A protein has these predicted regions:
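A conserved regulatory-domain signal marking ACT and ACT-like small-molecule sensing domains
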Residues: 1-189
């Protein structure tokens, strides 16, 4: 949610052993939010840079009843022309691999975003993953991994597909149109 709209507020919760490193994670969070920002800043300078960019940054204490082990939750609020958007993402490192474990209300994701990844959100209904797979296959693209959690409250699904090669913007747009996607984007990390 929010796309490339200006970020106004970021709240982070550090769980487990990451709590003791939270101030040292401020600079990598800044770099992830604002790729053009100065790299390698000390914690206080990173917080100042966030303020200079008009971003309120808050490191929250976790609620003791949350069993998220060593993970980080980022809640990002964006605003443009008095319209507000909110995105929440939780990440964890599993077997040495950084994974997104939750995106907004899509729990149990555990997606490795390294390489080429497609993210498509749509109204949940049968056959959508087959349509996506068929379109990729027709273009010689193989699926390396897939996660497709549903949000039963909104009746939406999020499909995160890791492919063996980049997917063109044209193909992604074609797939998004065919499945009537609410949102669709690709990452190359």
């Amino acid at each position: 949610a929010g796309g490339n709209k200006p970020i106004r507020r970021v709240e982070c919760t550090f769980y487990g052993n990451l709590r003791i490193f939270r101030k040292w994670l401020t600079a990598p969070i800044l770099e992830g939010l604002l790729p053009h920002a100065e790299k390698g800043l000390m914690p206080a300078a990173a917080e100042e840079s966030l303020r200079e960019h008009g971003i309120v940054f808050k490191a929250r204490e976790p609620k003791d009843d949350k069993p998220y082990e060593d993970s980080i939750t980022l809640d990002v609020a964006m605003e443009e022309e008095e319209e507000y958007f909110h995105t929440s993402v939780r990440g964890v490192v599993t077997e040495g691999i950084p994974m997104v474990s939750r995106l907004n209300n899509f729990n149990g994701l555990y997606a490795d975003l390294r390489g080429t990844t497609l993210c498509l959100r749509y109204k949940d209904r049968p056959g959508i993953i087959a349509l996506i797979g068929s379109a990729l296959s027709s273009n010689g693209i193989n699926i390396d991994n897939i996660a497709a959690p549903a949000d039963h409250a909104t009746r939406e699904a999020l499909t995160v597909i890791k492919t063996n090669q980049p997917v063109s913007d044209e193909l992604l747009d074609k797939i998004a149109k065919e499945i009537d996607a609410i949102s669709a984007f690709s990452l190359n990390l």
